[in-house]
């Protein structure tokens, strides 16, 4: 009977989810991978309808130089606002019919079936999470997470975030500049990257990564032509660049789901992916529930893989964007 395999299915699902699942998703989503590896993923206890990030709106301007017998000014520091972010629940169902179970009764075949189902889930989460993390939060009738396009619009004085209007609240604006060419393709890219890096720098805190689309990435790579020797160790001509690209010592990477002509300069101190139940940044944020017996409507069992959280920001002035790159 199909239910005889349930203990095997349950244990294998749990083992796979705790093991390679999150690594395989990370490998396909550069932004998710960076958030995870840099310590920018954080836990959320799941209480309340919203998450809140405390944002400094202005620097305290009354640091006191104390004279002899002078009274200390105990006025509490002001200039803090709580910006709300709405956590979203993202799910992917895995359904296995009784017929599939009966056709895969042996342990090896059952495990192969589970791996195939989990591979589908990996690809679904990789595609979906990347789309959300770079999006504006309007897909699926607004049920998806807010992404970078919502947090960092091209025009940084337009729209609102967390109940605060950017036109009147300068502290919620991310630096944003145009990277349009003057004459030749990408002739302004390096200068704009330097500008956005410096604009987002506060002391030793600088952007940790630059993420763009494939076309801009290849344009940036083309700027390096003539600056490296295109040969391998054997002396054979190698016209492809195999090394990693960096800018000011920080990685430059590309992703599939970025809006064309965009580049984001991000800092791990200013951007967080907060996930319900997460204990450590490199832990898996995914959970699985089930099996759910679908009878009498369907002769099948279902499991549901879930991640619940939100992409949040705090120091907006240290998150930069170059748009309209050409």
Residue ranges and their predicted role:
Residues 1-326:
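Flexible, glycine/threonine- and acidic-rich loop/arm segments that mediate assembly and lattice contacts
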């Amino acid at each position: 009977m199909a239910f005889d395999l349930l203990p095997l299915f349950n244990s294998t699902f749990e083992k796979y989810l705790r093991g390679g699942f999150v690594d395989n998703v990370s490998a396909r989503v550069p932004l998710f991978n960076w958030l995870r590896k840099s310590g920018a993923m954080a836990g959320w206890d799941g209480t309340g309808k919203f998450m809140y990030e405390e944002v400094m709106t202005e620097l305290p301007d009354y640091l006191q130089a104390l004279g002899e017998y002078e009274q200390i000014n105990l006025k509490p520091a002001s200039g803090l606002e709580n910006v709300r972010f709405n956590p979203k629940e993202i799910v992917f169902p895995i359904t296995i019919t009784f017929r599939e179970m009966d056709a895969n009764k042996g342990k090896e075949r059952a495990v192969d079936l589970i791996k195939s189902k989990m591979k589908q889930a990996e690809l679904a989460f990789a595609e979906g999470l990347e789309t959300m993390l770079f999006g504006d939060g309007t897909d699926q009738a607004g049920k998806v997470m807010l992404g970078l396009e919502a947090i960092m619009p091209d025009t940084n004085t337009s729209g609102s975030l967390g109940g605060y209007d950017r036109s009147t609240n300068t502290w919620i604006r991310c630096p944003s500049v145009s990277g349009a060419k003057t004459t030749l393709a990408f002739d302004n890219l390096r200068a704009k990257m330097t500008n956005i890096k410096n604009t987002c720098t506060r002391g030793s805190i600088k952007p940790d990564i630059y993420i763009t689309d494939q076309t801009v990435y290849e344009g940036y790579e083309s700027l390096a032509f003539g600056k490296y020797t295109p040969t391998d160790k054997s002396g054979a001509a190698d016209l492809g660049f195999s090394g990693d690209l960096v800018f000011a010592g920080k990685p430059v990477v590309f992703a599939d789901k970025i809006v064309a002509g965009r580049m984001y300069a991000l800092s791990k101190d200013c951007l967080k992916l907060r996930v319900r139940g997460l204990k450590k940044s490199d832990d898996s944020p995914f959970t699985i529930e089930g099996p759910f017996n679908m009878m009498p409507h369907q002769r099948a069992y279902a499991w549901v893989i879930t991640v619940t959280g939100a992409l949040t920001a705090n120091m907006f002035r240290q998150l930069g964007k170059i748009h309209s790159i050409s």
